[in-house]
């Protein structure tokens, strides 16, 4: 509940209806950026939502935030390499989600120091269809194996582009482009919002496997069960259709 002291300085803009909307979306694992970008453009900034949470104006705690952000001054330690294609080179149709077959990729890791086991995650941008595969570690070789598995499972028509961050596991991009003919575009550093679909989907998967989980011990059955549930949830951004239904529709249009 909201404290009495918080109510004293409650912003006039924060109506009960607005508070209920924000609290509901936060409980659904949305980030403040996603809430503003989807439903509150021009109403307030996402920084305002963070402020309201920290100051106790909303009936949620900071635990509801999926990502707390990096501390100022921290340096990226995941390995550096030269990229060829950046997100600025990506076709506009990918940005607008106009066409089917464009994917965002990421890696979900186990708790630091606990295990090298991790998951390669893939999201089709137009349908939000979500795939995750177990990897032994966060290396370029393991990521290439995961991408190869996705390529062998789906047809090349369903894999037109990949958008990734600058993690060391994606140093396999030249091998991917050479062997599979799939261009790989790199997001800007510290710009997770440029891969918002994947960030959001990873947050949904974390509901099943919290950050302290040793992902090496997650069984294939449990992973599959979680993916089925996620892909069969109706999404507002899809007109309350499910990612699974939208993905099937996209495949049918290509056949």
Predicted feature locations:
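Basic, flexible linker segments flanking DNA-binding modules
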Residues: 1, 44-97
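Short, basic alpha-helical/linker "hinge" immediately adjacent to a nucleic-acid-recognition surface
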Residues: 1-25, 38
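Mobile genetic element proteins and their domesticated derivatives, centered on retroelements
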Residues: 22, 35, 49, 106, ...
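Two-metal-ion RNase H-like nuclease active-site motif
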Residues: 100-111
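Short conserved beta-strand segments at catalytic cores or DNA/RNA-binding microdomains
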Residues: 108, 114-131
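Active-site beta-loop-alpha junctions of metal-dependent nucleic acid enzymes
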Residues: 111, 115, 132-156
């Amino acid at each position: 509940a909201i404290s009495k002291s918080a109510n004293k300085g409650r912003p006039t803009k924060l109506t009960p209806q607005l508070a209920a909307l924000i609290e509901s979306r936060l409980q659904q694992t949305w980030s403040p950026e996603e809430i503003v970008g989807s439903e509150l453009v021009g109403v307030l900034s996402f920084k305002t939502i963070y402020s309201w949470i920290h100051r106790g104006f909303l009936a949620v705690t900071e635990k509801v935030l999926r990502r707390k952000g990096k501390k100022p001054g921290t340096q990226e330690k995941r390995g550096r390499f030269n990229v060829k294609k950046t997100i600025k080179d990506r076709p506009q149709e990918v940005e607008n989600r106009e066409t089917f077959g464009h994917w965002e990729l990421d890696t979900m890791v186990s708790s630091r120091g606990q295990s090298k086991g991790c998951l390669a995650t893939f999201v089709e941008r137009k349908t939000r269809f979500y795939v995750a595969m177990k990897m032994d570690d966060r290396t370029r070789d393991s990521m290439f194996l995961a991408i190869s598995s996705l390529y062998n499972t789906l047809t090349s028509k369903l894999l037109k582009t990949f958008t990734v961050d600058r993690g060391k596991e994606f140093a396999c991009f030249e091998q991917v482009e050479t062997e599979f003919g799939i261009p790989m575009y790199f997001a800007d550093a510290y710009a997770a919002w440029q891969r918002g679909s994947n960030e959001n989907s990873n947050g949904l998967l974390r509901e099943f496997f919290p950050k302290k989980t040793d992902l090496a011990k997650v069984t294939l059955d449990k992973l599959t069960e979680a993916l089925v549930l996620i892909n069969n949830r109706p999404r507002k951004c899809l007109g309350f259709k499910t990612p699974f239904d939208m993905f099937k529709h996209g495949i049918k249009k290509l056949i």
